[in-house]
Each structure stands twice: as structure tokens, then as C-alpha cells.
């Protein structure tokens, strides 16, 4: 019992940015999870919440990602780059990243002696799965869960495939 009081559990909000919700790469599925994400954020204190923020610059279209996905999105300083206004509830830390996964986030979780991490956000099949697997690699004893009801993928099919991939890598998928 006393151990459970000392456990450190964090929530990580992945790339919950305007461009992925109703902007250049937005989807109706992303818009549909907004209320659930806001509800989930409210169950954690500010010092228990982390976030990632996809961050690109003017040279995006010259990058490998930009050549494979030639849609300008999440350019730093633009409205599309901002975390959705209802999700701006305060975070212990926000990790800006210009790649799918944040090594800095994974190192932070390892170095902070975290016991459990819950991930929510966008896109299940790109940045959520990338960050879940990075955390699993950097901190293999941390219990990782992903709330499927607070995530969405590029397509419903790729969302499902990513959830199955994470399950096979010993990541607990809840509300599936």
C-alpha cells in the first residue's frame, strides 16, 4: 500500500496540435476525440502531465519526412503548431520534436524514475507508437499504457494496426 503512494505516474499528450485536429492534416476522427482527451487531462495534475509538440520549420519540404508527406504542417509559431486550446491545461514539460519520436522524452522518463506512463494523442500509427516504443527501449521496466479512446490514427485501419503492434511489444492498450 505505501509503495503505491510513492509511485510516479505520468501522462504524455502526443502532438495534440491544431494542424492534426482541424488543420492541414486534420481528420473527423481527431476532432471526435477532443472531449475524451480533455477529460483525461483533467485526471492528472499539472506536474504529472508532459506533452510533445511536432515542430517543423521553413525547410520542411526538403526533409525526408517532407518529401514523403509533402503537406506543410506544425510550422513553429503558426496557429497550426499550437496545442489545441482546450488542451492547454499546463504541463510539467513540453518536448518539441521534428521527428516522429522524442529521444529527449524517453531519456527524461528513464532519468526521472517514473513507474508508469500513459500515452494519448495523435497519430496512433506514427508518433504515438514511435514514442511508446522509444520509452519501452529507454526505460524497459516502466509500465506503459496507451488509451485507445484518446488516440486516433491517419486512418481507422492504421490506428488499429498500431494498437496491435504496441500490444505485441508489451504495451498495455486500454479502452480498446
Region locations from a protein language model:
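Internal catalytic-core helix/loop-beta-alpha segment
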Residues: 77-126
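Conserved strand-to-helix beginnings and helix N-cap segments that scaffold or border functional pockets
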Residues: 106, 129-132, 156-160
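A short glycine-rich beta-strand->turn/loop micro-motif centered on a GG-aromatic cluster
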Residues: 118-122, 142-156, 176
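Cofactor-binding loop segments of dinucleotide-utilizing enzymes, especially the Rossmann-like FAD-
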Residues: 14, 54, 122-124, 149
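Histidine-anchored nucleotide/phosphate-binding helix
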Residues: 39-41, 129-139
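A short helix->loop->beta-strand "cap" motif at the edges of active sites that frequently abuts
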Residues: 45-47, 139-143
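Short, conserved acidic/polar surface loops in the N-terminal third of protein domains
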Residues: 60-64, 105-107, 130
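Active-site acidic carboxylates
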Residues: 2-94, 154, 160-167, 172-175
